[in-house]
Design a protein with these regions (language model features):
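Short C-terminal boundary/hinge segments that cap the last helix of small helical domains
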Residues: 66-77
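Short alpha-helical "recognition helix" segments of helix-turn-helix
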Residues: 32-33, 61
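Helix-turn-helix DNA-binding elements, focusing on the entry/boundary residues of the two helices
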Residues: 18, 29, 55-58, 69
Length: 77
C-alpha cells in the first residue's frame, strides 16, 4: 500500500504562488523545472506542498520567473 503524501500548508502556499507566477507568464512546468535546474518530480513536490522548497530553490524560482521572493512567499504571515 502506497503512503499518502503529507501536505505542508505553508509549503502549499509557496507552491501556489510559484504556480500562479508561472501560469501568468505562460510557462510550462517542465520548462520551469529545466530553467530552475531541478527535476520535474522535485518541482511537482514543491508546487503541491508535499515538500518545502529550499531557500536556494526559492531564490532560483524568483530569478527565473522575475518575481520577488516576497511575492512568492505572500500569505505565509
Amino acid at each position: 500500500m502506497k503512503n499518502k503524501a503529507v501536505i505542508n500548508p505553508l509549503a502549499q502556499i509557496v507552491g501556489k504562488n510559484i504556480t500562479a507566477a508561472a501560469v501568468d507568464l505562460g510557462w510550462t512546468f517542465p520548462q520551469l523545472a529545466k530553467d530552475m535546474d531541478v527535476r520535474e518530480e522535485t518541482l511537482q513536490r514543491w508546487l503541491t506542498g508535499e515538500r518545502m522548497i529550499t531557500v536556494f530553490g526559492l531564490v532560483r524560482a524568483s530569478r527565473v520567473l522575475g518575481v520577488s521572493m516576497e511575492a512568492l512567499t505572500k500569505g505565509l504571515l
